[in-house]
Structures are given as structure tokens and as C-alpha cells.
Amino acid sequence: IVVSDEIHSDFTWGENKHLMFASLSDDFADISITCTAPSKTFNLAGLQVSNIFIPNETLRFKFKKAVDAAGYSQVNVMGLEACQAAYEYGEEWLTQLKEYLKDNIAFVREFIQTRLPKLTMIEPEGTYLLWIDFRALGLTEAQRQDLIENKANLWLDSGAMFGPDGEGFE
């Protein structure tokens, strides 16, 4: 079973397109649980609503049974209505949000290039989260965290939390 968190799927940049895991083949769809939500796209996190797509009927039945047993069978009606309204009427919101985010990404890119030239921003293909490469500074994880938290007064997520390939990134 593959649980695919596709909460950032509404955010792609340039010519990039998001392909849902389940759309890649019938075999993939048969083993997939796809999770999306309007929380990132439409700023609705407080309404605690998400979408879970399970094409496989047997898997969907097992999931529903587990959800019911855990006591989560009730739907947040306000969240459900907001989710539906957001996807039905929110295209202009999303268009404006993406323009705003593009400007933010451009600002970070220029700031790093002009003021922090040893750092590199990885150009995002999707999402509004940015990967900043700190490896050229030659710092240990502890030194980098000290620099970021105590000298720059920033709170960033260490790339190491995503595994060895994320080490040196924030």
C-alpha cells in the first residue's frame, strides 16, 4: 500500500505538472491511498478537512472500518462546505496566491544571490517550500543550526530530517 500525501499538488511552477501517484497506472491506483486537502491551497487548516481517495473498494472498506472504530466517522460539516466552495469558486484566489508566492520565491532567490552567495536556493518545481543548500559553508549540523537559530534568528527545518540526502539543506 502506498499512502501518497499530495497536499501541495495545487502548487506547480513553470511547465511542471503534478501527476497523482494513482493516475500513473491501474496497478498503482489499486494499491494507493491519496491524501489531499484545501488547507495549503486555500488557507483552511483550521477547519480540519481533507480528502482521501481510495480507488480499491476492499482497501476503502478496511480504511472506513478503521476510521469508524477510531471514532472519526463524523465529518466537519463546515469544513466540508468550505472545501467544496474553495474548489468550486476559488480559482481566482489560487491564481492570485500563486502570483504572490512567485514573488516571494523571486525575493528569496535574489536575497540569497546578492547577500548570501555561498548559499544556493534549489528552484522549486512545485510547492512553496524552498530548499536552501548550506553545504558550501562547511559547517557541521550543530554549527549550522547555531548559525540559523542563534545568529540569524530563524527557525528552519533541517533537511537531515528527510534522510541523508537532505543533510546540509534547510
Report each predicted region and the residues it spans:
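Conserved PLP phosphate-binding loop immediately N-terminal to the Schiff-base lysine helix
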Residues: I1-S23
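Conserved C-terminal alpha-helix-loop-beta "cap" of PLP-dependent enzymes
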Residues: L119-T120, I132-E170
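Conserved core segment of the aminotransferase class I/II
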Residues: D26, D30-K102, R109-F111
